[in-house]
Each structure stands twice: as C-alpha cells, then as structure tokens.
UniProtKB/Swiss-Prot annotation:
HAMAP family: Ribosomal_uL22_B. The lineage of its organism: Bacteria, Pseudomonadati, Pseudomonadota, Alphaproteobacteria, Hyphomicrobiales. It comes from Mesorhizobium japonicum (strain LMG 29417 / CECT 9101 / MAFF 303099). This is Large ribosomal subunit protein uL22. Disulfide bonds: none annotated. This protein binds specifically to 23S rRNA; its binding is stimulated by other ribosomal proteins, e.g. L4, L17, and L20. It is important during the early stages of 50S assembly. It makes multiple contacts with different domains of the 23S rRNA in the assembled 50S subunit and ribosome.
C-alpha cells in the first residue's frame, strides 16, 4: 500500500543537482551562477575552473554532480548537455554579535544560500547526413 510515487518534475531530457546551505550570500553566488547559465557543460566547466571567485569550485562540483546524474540516472549524452537553469535561493541567516566601543554591540549577519543546477540534453544542430 502506501503513497503513489510522485511524478517526475523535470522533462525526460533533463537532470538536476541541488546544493543546500552554502555559506555565501545569494548575491555573490548568483554572479557565478549567471556565468554558466545557458552554456554547454564543457564550456561552463572550463569557465568555472579559471574563475577567480571563491565559490566557483563549489559550483563546479555541483555542476559535475548534475552531469553525473544525467549520465548515470537518466542515460543522457554528456556531450549534448547544456546548463538549462542555474538559480540561487536564500537559506538561513546566522546572526552574530560584534562588540563595539563604549559598551555597545552590533549585529553581524552571515547569510547562506541554496544552488540548483538543471542540465538539459539538446540535439546538435547542423548534423544532417
């Protein structure tokens, strides 16, 4: 008995990877996500490899996870994958206290983010035999 299996939210030619609670602000993470949005996965991986942003290594790992999910779980062709979506969401915000002069205190906020990457298999254009 039990509950029926939920329908798949993505199309049959898509796979995704989600990384939650990353210790970086969503605004900074979105700069790196925008760098790979809409690109082929090989180009996106090389862009992340040589990016100077601190978080680019973490985003690269998540993209590699999405590629592995596409290959192993959904039998998609790795060479025909593009980054269909790369979006960032807000997570928790840790609040910390910072002692200031004259006995006062101020608040330091340490934001966290969520990252979702969706890769899609596209057919190559111009391969008419």
């Amino acid at each position: 008995m039990g509950k029926a299996k939920a329908p798949r939210r993505l199309a049959d030619n898509e796979a995704r990877a989600v990384l939650r609670t990353i210790r970086i602000s969503p605004q900074k993470l979105n700069l790196v996500a925008a760098l790979i949005r809409g690109k082929k996965v090989a180009t996106a991986l090389s862009d992340l490899e040589f990016s100077a942003k601190r978080i680019s290594g973490t985003v690269k790992k998540t993209l590699e996870s999405a590629i592995a999910n596409a290959e192993n779980n959904h039998d998609l062709d790795v060479d025909a994958l593009v980054v269909a979506e790369a979006y960032v969401g807000k997570s928790i915000v840790m609040k910390r206290f910072h002692a200031r002069g004259r006995g006062r205190a101020s608040r330091i906020e340490k934001p966290f983010s969520h990252l979702t990457i969706v890769v899609r298999e596209v057919e190559e254009k111009g391969e008419a035999a």
